[in-house]
Amino acid sequence: MGVFLDMRTSMNSGTVGQPGLSLGPSPEAFGSIGLQTLGVPNPIITLNGTVGVTGEVGDTFVVELVRGSVYDPFYVIYRAEGTVGQNGGAEFHSFTAQDLSAPPALESVYTSFISGVSTSVRTGPEVFHGIAASN
């Protein structure tokens, strides 16, 4: 049976219409959390979140989750590509990932990033959650 260690939430935007920023080719952070993992070996980290995107039909975007606070492709633990399916309306895209190979640390930091074509806009909400447990 698993043992609960910590749970954190990062809410960049809780409403539709914000932050209203265009996507670009470089990943931009929309959430960051630090989970207290207490130096436990092999913690089980479960991450999830939602991002709202508006754009032209067929516009693509990428959500990446990184172990750490700075974007580095080496530390990407999750990558998902999405496509805008309707014109003009806000679409909500949710994701769930696990980091089953997190190193023992007092705190494990995770950051969520988004990138995409410039005709797409981050319309919110933008939330990022994490739970740490041990077995």
Features from the language model and the residues they span:
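Terminal (often C-terminal
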Residues: 1-44, 56, 129-135
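Terminal beta-strand-rich extracellular "head" domains
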Residues: 50-107, 113-135
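Aromatic- and Gly/Pro-rich donor/ligand-binding loops
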Residues: 47
